[in-house]
């Protein structure tokens, strides 16, 4: 795995001096976040992710592209596994869930490596601790603290899940209470956009519609994505104003289920059951953003895979990769 070479490296510089050079690394893996435009053209009454689209159009100190993931419509934990360990699901049996089957002891991973450099490493997920065995797995990957739903006091909800806006509030809270001079690594897995998308709710009214399509799930999904886009803008806007060097990474774990995607495919002469191999690959693409509040080489259209993304993050963070 790419990250194995990072494990156990000796840091021969003065630790306090080194810590100050290291940027905070804030990672948001956003539940079901994707840009369905990769599947084909469609027209909405308003842009469903205007902020992310603006970042893709050549924003300063920003790297954007599409991430190839190994899951579609579910199995979030596998994208987590690929990002955090640098391992690929391609080398594991079909149907595997590494969190539940293979991680039984400490293994080389991004949080463990960052912890060895002096980072405070925090995983946060506003749902139940035992989901995908995260409460057991996170410490084995090197997280010093794990925060779950029971610690999201006073959080706002969208439908029946903690909102992305409240996830951003939690990240800001973690940053503001951290030890000064100690770099912070936060890995946030959101819940707001979790399927299904057919029920109605008193606390959420979908407002994005697709021309020529009547689909409650699609409208609800795109409206949720719009809220995620607003939360991303809030997160980056906050760190634009902070003094400490900080890098923000944002990506989706997978596309939504076929119920959401089918109308877009149908508009473009496809169905979920008749996709060619190349068309099916499009169902495994999600957008990603790497943004920094300091100078990095901006790049758009830089496509990669979930298991390579952490190495890119370390590169832009100025952390040795060999």
PLM feature segments, named:
Residues 5-23, 27-30, 34-322:
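Solvent-exposed soluble domains appended to multi-pass membrane proteins
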């Amino acid at each position: 795995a790419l990250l194995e070479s990072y494990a156990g490296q000796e840091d021969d510089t003065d630790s306090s001096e080194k810590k100050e050079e290291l940027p905070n690394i804030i990672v948001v893996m956003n539940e079901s976040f994707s840009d369905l435009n990769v599947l084909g053209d469609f027209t909405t009454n308003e842009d469903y992710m205007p902020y992310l689209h603006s970042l893709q159009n050549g924003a300063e100190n920003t790297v954007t592209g599409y991430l190839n993931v190994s899951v579609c419509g579910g199995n979030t934990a596998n994208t987590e596994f690929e990002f955090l360990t640098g391992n690929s699901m391609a080398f594991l049996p079909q149907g595997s869930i590494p969190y539940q089957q293979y991680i039984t002891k400490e293994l080389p991973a991004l949080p463990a490596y960052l912890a060895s450099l002096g980072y405070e490493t925090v995983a946060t997920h506003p749902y139940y601790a035992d989901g995908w065995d995260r409460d057991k797995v996170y410490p084995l990957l090197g997280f010093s603290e794990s925060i779950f739903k029971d610690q999201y006091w006073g959080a706002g909800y969208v439908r029946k899940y903690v909102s992305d806006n409240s996830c951003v509030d939690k990240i800001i809270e973690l940053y503001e209470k951290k030890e000064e001079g100690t770099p912070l690594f936060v890995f946030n897995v959101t819940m707001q956009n979790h399927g299904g998308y057919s029920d109605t709710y008193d606390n959420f009214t979908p407002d994005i519609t697709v021309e020529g399509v009547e689909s409650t799930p699609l409208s609800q999904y795109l409206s949720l994505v719009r809220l995620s886009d607003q939360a991303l803008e809030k997160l980056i806007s906050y760190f634009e104003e902070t003094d400490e060097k900080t890098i923000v990474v944002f990506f989706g774990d997978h596309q939504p289920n076929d119920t959401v995607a089918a109308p877009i495919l149908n508009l473009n002469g496809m169905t979920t059951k008749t996709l060619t191999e190349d068309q099916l690959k499009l169902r495994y693409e999600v957008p990603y953003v790497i943004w920094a509040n300091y100078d990095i080489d901006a790049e758009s259209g830089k496509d990669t895979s979930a298991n390579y993304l952490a190495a890119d993050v370390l590169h832009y963070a100025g952390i040795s990769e060999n």
